[in-house]
Amino acid sequence: GEYLIGSYGVRSDKEALIYIAEQFELKPKIVKLVDEKFYHLDTCFQNLPTNNNDAIFYPEAFEDSSLNEFSDLFNLIPVSENDANKLACNSVVINESVIFPSDDIDIIETVADLGCNIEISDVSEFLKSGGACQCLVITLQ
């Protein structure tokens, strides 16, 4: 793609992201995370496999002004605090499927209505350490 999508805050550095974007000649789209529970972008944001660039996200995890970086790229769909705490955004996308960490997540119905296939993988033991589905995956491309 033409963009580097990233976040900084508790565990990441904005300058490092800008440097990486420059090295690969990408436009940086970087947001600031402000909630320590959501320490990486994949804990509070997930791009969905739809034609409209839909993405679920937890608004309270982000500095309000930095969300403007994403508003021109994504149709942002907020998740509730309850869903965020269940790490709904830490789902995994494979083709047209979205794998959620629990079936007790309200946003699942909305995501299904967008045309995504829904899969559930119970990772409740991993949730105790602050991670879910995406934290258990290494993507190879």
PLM features: residue spans?
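The feature marks the mature, well-folded catalytic cores of soluble enzymes
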Residues: 1-141
